[in-house]
Structures are given as C-alpha cells and as structure tokens.
C-alpha cells in the first residue's frame, strides 16, 4: 500500500502509474507494486492430482513457482493454496 507524499491519501493504480484521486499526484514507479484483489470463489470442487483427492475452492492466486493464476484454496484461515498447474503448495 502506498500513500501520496503530497496529501497522504491512498494511491490507486491506473494503467502503468499510481495516481492520487485527491490531489492528482502521479508516480510512474509501479513495477514494485503487487496488486491483490478479492475474487468470488466458485463452489467447492473435488480435484484429483497425482492420485490424491484434494477438496477446496478454485481460486485466483499467483503461484510463486510457475506463475499460474489457478489454485485450490486448501485452508482459508492460513491462506494455503495448491497450484493447479504444478501442484506447488504455498501461502500468501
């Protein structure tokens, strides 16, 4: 989360820059920004991977190993995911 150096408001990402909606300040240094957004999860699904049954919700989460955005939410409280492409288990 980044804040405007002029007025202290939250900076929003617009295209390839960050913009303050209050005073209009813009910053082109967005390569360090990680965007997260809430996604409505699909209904629970059962997935079979490598002969192992995995139950969970299909979610959009970036896998740190292969870069895929499809994952199974294994544990919501611990934010534990399993990548649907490479089966890597990670948390965010």
Curated annotation (Swiss-Prot):
Requisite cofactors: Zn(2+)
Active site, per annotation: 76-78
Cofactor notes: Binds 2 Zn(2+) ions.
InterPro entries cross-referenced by the UniProt entry: DNA-dir_RNA_pol-M_15_CS, Zn_ribbon_RPB9
Molecular function as annotated in GO: DNA-directed RNA polymerase activity; metal ion binding
ZR-N as annotated region, ranges: 1-31
Chain positions recorded as Zn(2+) 2 binding sites: 63, 66, 83, 86
Induction of synthesis: At least 4-fold induced following infection by Sulfolobus turreted icosahedral virus 1 (STIV-1) in strain 2-2-12. Undetected in non-infected cells. Induced following STIV-1 infection, protein is detectable by 12 hours post-infection (p.i.) and increases until at least 24 hours p.i. in strain 2-2-12 (at protein level).
Binding site for Zn(2+) 1: 4, 7, 20, 23
Region (Flexible linker): 32-56
Region (ZR-C): 55-92
GO CC annotation terms, alphabetical: DNA-directed RNA polymerase complex
Pfam families: Zn_ribbon_RPB9
GO biological process per UniProt: defense response to virus; DNA-templated transcription; negative regulation of DNA-templated transcription
Record key words, sorted: Antiviral defense, DNA-directed RNA polymerase, Metal-binding, Repressor, Transcription, Transcription regulation, Zinc
Protein family (similarity comment): Belongs to the archaeal RpoM/eukaryotic RPA12/RPB9/RPC11 RNA polymerase family.
Function (record text): A potent inhibitor of RNA polymerase (RNAP) probably involved in viral defense. Destabilizes the transcription pre-initiation complex of TBP, TFB, DNA and RNAP, inhibits abortive transcription initiation, productive initiation and transcription elongation. Increases the RNAP KM for NTPs about 50-fold. Overexpression of TFS1-tip4 (TFS1 with the active tip of this protein, phenocopies this protein) in S.acidocaldarius MW001 leads to severe growth inhibition.
Domain notes: Has 2 zinc-ribbon domains (ZR-N and ZR-C); functionally important residues Lys-76, Lys-77 and Lys-78 are probably located at the tip of a domain that extends from ZR-C into the RNAP active site. The nature of these residues determines if the protein is involved in stalled transcript cleavage and thus activation (Asp and Glu residues in TFS1) or in RNAP inhibition (Lys or Arg residues in this protein TFS4). Increasing numbers of Lys residues lead to an increased ability to inhibit transcription.
Subunit composition and interactions: Interacts with RNA polymerase.
Note: Strain 2-2-12 is a substrain of P2 that is highly susceptible to infection by Sulfolobus turreted icosahedral virus 1 (STIV-1).
Protein known as: Transcription factor S4
Record organism: Saccharolobus solfataricus (strain ATCC 35092 / DSM 1617 / JCM 11322 / P2) (Sulfolobus solfataricus)
């Amino acid at each position: 989360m980044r804040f405007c150096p002029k007025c202290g408001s939250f900076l929003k990402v617009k295209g390839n820059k960050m913009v303050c909606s209050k005073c209009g300040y813009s910053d082109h240094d967005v390569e360090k920004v990680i965007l997260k957004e809430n996604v409505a999860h699909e209904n629970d699904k059962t997935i079979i991977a490598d002969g192992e049954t995995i139950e969970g919700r299909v979610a959009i989460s970036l896998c740190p190993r292969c870069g895929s955005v499809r994952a199974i939410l294994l544990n919501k409280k611990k934010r534990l995911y399993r990548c649907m492409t490479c089966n890597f288990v990670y948390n965010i």
